[in-house]
Amino acid sequence: DDRGETWERLDGNGLPSGFGFALAIHPRDPDTAWVVPEEGAENRVTSDGRLGVYRTRDAGATWDVRPAYDEAWVAILREDGASDWLDPVGVYVGTQSGSIFVSPDEGETWVEAARHLPPVLSVEVAEWQ
């Protein structure tokens, strides 16, 4: 672990493509992350028309998919993923079609929390008291 000094390609190992955005990192476990793979830079739509959030718990060596929504030819931008600091960690993904998907349990299950918003260009999480 060199705090981002060096990088390696992580396509394969369970990911359907080597292109994707909406990367969210677990706030307490740097080996756990979530990403939404997309078909490529030109189309930027979810693989196979399904919104699947892929999770790694071993720093990208392997990935498993958690389906969030079927029949979702949606585009995700670079800053459209976030995680909170709760226990369990909540994970959030926004789409250019105006939906926000939320997982309250570290990516195990997903719900569409909002729809018909303007295009979501960025997702940030703040603690509300």
Short names for language-model regions:
Residues 1-129:
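Extracellular glycan-interacting surfaces
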